[in-house]
Amino acid sequence: MALALGGGGVRGYAHLGVLWVLEEAGIPIRGLAGSSAGALAACAWAFGHKDPWKVHQAVFDKEVANLRRAGNLRLLARLFSALRRQALADTAKVAEGLKRLFGEARLEDSPIPLAIQAADLLTGEAVVLRQGPAWKAVLASAAIPGLFPPVAWEGRLLVDGDVAEKVPVRAAKALFPKVVAVDVSNPPPNEPPKTALEAVLLAGEASRRRLKELALQGADLVLSLDPPFPIDTFDHEKLPLVYTLGQKRAQEKLREIQALSRLRLKDLPHLLAPRPPRPA
């Protein structure tokens, strides 16, 4: 089977917990598609970096982490100062960390087929990367618009893959017909907005949530993180929680995952790509 690993900041470390459970259960992984934090998890696992704490240490940027701790006035001041800049934060330290983590590794050389999803900043189109430096593909897939600068890639400006599709189910299907989608989204808010800005942000989130739900319909099985409370994108102190929660959710659905893994492809005719007609 292939896994579609969705974005979610620090919640993305749950993917490594899920993959650990599948490996322990002897379930073969035929492909990994990742978007944003899911891209980091997919590449890390495929190239043998399975310890979430070591991965986190490689990419941790104190400046980015401080965005969460900044008070509203300080954050607002930074936003206004960034209006004339390309992004709120620099990615130089993150890029260096990714280079140290992945070295010269390239997507096409991965032991597990990889599909890293980013988005074209100008068109919003999903861009699935199958070749190129792993570190740069992850950087592009996680470039949150406004927060991080876009990444130039073959004449395009690429940003966070979540802009196009939060959980890259279609990219995973292109790797292998049987797909387990792992959604690490926060639960929807249960309180009404208090300001006009909050209302605008909530409306955008609601729209993206609906698009995500439509994408998840293409998966054969959906594994949702369902955290007990909202976990901030950059709340790195929650890493142990999300990792163990990922393990727990995978264990809860292990029988279903095993059943899907054993299902023969010929029993899934609606999922297989049509074969070209034989010559007469």
Stretch-by-stretch model annotation:
Residues 1-23, 27-30, 41-46, 174-177, ...:
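Catalytic domains of lipid- and phosphate-ester/thioester hydrolases
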Residues 178-223:
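Helix-centered, glycine/charged polyanion-binding patches within enzymatic domains
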Residues 1-4, 9-94, 98, 130-139, ...:
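Patatin-like phospholipase
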Residues 48-51, 196-201, 240-241:
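Short, hinge-like loop/turn segments at secondary-structure boundaries
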Residues 65-89, 189-208, 267-276:
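Alpha-helical membrane-targeting segments
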Residues 55-68, 205-220, 255-256:
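Short, basic, helix/turn surface patches
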Residues 71-189, 221-223, 228-229, 233-260:
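Active-site-adjacent alpha/beta core region of enzyme catalytic domains
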